[in-house]
């Protein structure tokens, strides 16, 4: 076992007598989830499950609404990634109404979206993931949080984290009316243009975000890559490793693009096996969703291979759509600093003997901070574009119909698919969100980590946190992912007295 995953400091490994270990609630993720680990008679892991016990149901209650409301409604899917849903939904509405936005509008949307990426990746790396690396997997539970990270790295760095994330939020607010649940997008364009004063303010904040992106990549190099234990953790095939298919979006030159481009699926050995056409409108040729009775979250798979269960490898249709996936699919970045980090990333793994895609789940964290830097650089580029203050920001729409919007959300490839009648009323909605793409892989990762770490009845808080690290790398957003109802919805209403005791429990199963 990788030494850093063994008992650290006050983390005490003890023998359990339980054959069922439940981690509930899970920590440092968006939404609710739990992990169930089942031990065999020898105290080793027989199976483990990543479960999402919450339901949101957005697909159903979008039906019957005016279709042009959906980019405002679906942004309520989540308070962490409303920008991704809003922009993707707006792209779907362009298609629904048969309109292509002006170039200035496209650039303003992307400008907004790059700020969203910066905010999201900063939030995940520093608030959710960093504690596992800065403090260590086995650090005391009470310290494994953002306050513990700030205590370890210092108030000055903590201040920079808060400042630059707030800059990203302020840019979204300036462009979108508000940072959370924005209203920038309308079918055929954007709601408003920006003036030179606003552009200059955005440029100044973008410059700070670029510097912070550079700092974050250097911090990752110093804290993680230069620590042999952490490097061993990343490249440990026994704990955090799966050979899967990968999905990502690239531009016409094969370079990374979050807002627009072709969606490309590659095999575990790196060959291109599918490319979405017509703006992703043929996505249903390539991906499908499977349901299992123990989760409200669907399981995506690569349709030409098919659903073979929760197994990895070339013969399984399970694929990943994450920052790791995007760096496997893309030929590089269009911005210089991110491209330099991209070359360092792949060069490091080549030196470690990796040929083809990088399959190490923990490398997703490295990929994410590289993407943060790219988003900041692209944010700066767009803020300096002479066309960004143009006044032609909307084209007229046509009669409503059917439309698909697709882009790269921070957590993976996102699809919004709407059908409307001639009156513009929504008759069907399909959402394939980043986390749904990764539901199968997260289950695989949790099971593999648990199997590798829990042996002979021996368990500790640090080891269970190391199991949680398996899903944390994916940055799951469970509010987004549990948007539909695959089966029944059991519900308990618990009525309590003033002293907290239970007076009555009313159950239903419908």
Model regions and ranges:
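Active-site bordering "gate/hinge" segments
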Residues: 2-411, 433-510
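Low-complexity, glycine/alanine/valine/leucine- and proline-rich hydrophobic stretches
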Residues: 410, 417-437
């Amino acid at each position: 076992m990788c030494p850093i995953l063994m008992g650290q400091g006050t983390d005490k490994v003890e023998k359990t007598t339980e054959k069922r270990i439940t981690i509930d609630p899970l920590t440092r993720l968006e939404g609710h989830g739990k992990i169930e680990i089942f031990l065999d008679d020898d105290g080793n892991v027989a199976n483990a499950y990543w479960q999402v016990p919450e339901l949101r149901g957005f697909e159903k209650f979008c039906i019957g609404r005016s279709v042009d409301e959906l980019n405002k409604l679906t942004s309520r899917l989540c308070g962490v990634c409303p920008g991704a849903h809003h922009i993707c939904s707006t792209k779907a509405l362009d298609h629904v109404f048969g309109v292509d936005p002006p170039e200035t509008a496209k650039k303003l949307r992307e400008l907004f979206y790059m700020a969203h990426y910066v905010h999201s990746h900063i939030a995940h790396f520093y608030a959710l993931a960093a504690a596992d690396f800065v403090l260590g997997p086995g650090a005391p539970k009470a310290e494994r949080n953002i306050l513990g990270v700030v205590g370890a790295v210092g108030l000055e760095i903590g201040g920079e984290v808060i400042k630059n994330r707030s800059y990203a939020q302020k840019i979204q607010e300036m462009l979108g009316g508000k940072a959370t649940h924005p209203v920038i997008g309308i079918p055929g364009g954007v709601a408003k243009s920006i003036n030179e004063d606003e552009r200059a303010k955005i440029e100044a904040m973008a410059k700070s975000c670029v510097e912070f992106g550079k700092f974050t990549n250097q911090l990752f190099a110093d804290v993680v890559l230069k620590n042999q234990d952490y490097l061993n953790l990343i490249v440990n095939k026994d704990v955090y490793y799966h050979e899967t298919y990968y999905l990502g979006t690239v531009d016409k030159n094969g370079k990374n693009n979050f807002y627009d481009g072709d969606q490309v699926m590659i095999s575990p050995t790196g060959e291109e096996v599918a490319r979405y056409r017509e703006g992703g409108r043929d996505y249903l040729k390539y991906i499908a969703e499977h349901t299992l009775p123990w989760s409200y979250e669907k399981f995506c798979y690569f349709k030409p291979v098919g659903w073979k269960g929760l197994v990895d490898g070339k013969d399984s249709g399970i694929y990943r759509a994450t920052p790791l996936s995007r760096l496997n699919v893309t030929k590089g970045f269009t911005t210089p600093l991110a491209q330099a980090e991209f070359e360092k990333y792949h060069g490091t793994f080549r030196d470690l003997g990796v040929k083809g895609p990088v399959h190490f789940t923990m490398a997703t964290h490295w990929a994410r901070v590289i993407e943060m830097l790219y988003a900041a650089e692209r944010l700066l580029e767009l803020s300096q574009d002479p066309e960004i203050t143009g006044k032609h920001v909307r084209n007229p729409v046509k009669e409503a119909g059917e439309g698909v919007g697709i882009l790269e959300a921070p957590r993976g490839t996102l699809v919004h698919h709407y059908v409307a009648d001639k009156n513009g009323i929504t008759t069907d909605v399909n959402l394939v969100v980043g986390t749904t793409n990764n539901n199968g892989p997260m289950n695989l990762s949790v099971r593999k980590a648990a199997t590798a770490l829990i042996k002979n009845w021996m368990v500790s808080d640090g080891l269970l946190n190391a199991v949680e690290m398996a899903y944390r790398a994916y940055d799951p957003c469970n509010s987004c992912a549990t948007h539909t109802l695959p089966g029944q919805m059991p519900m308990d209403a618990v009525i309590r007295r003033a002293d907290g005791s239970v007076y009555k429990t009313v159950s239903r199963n419908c």
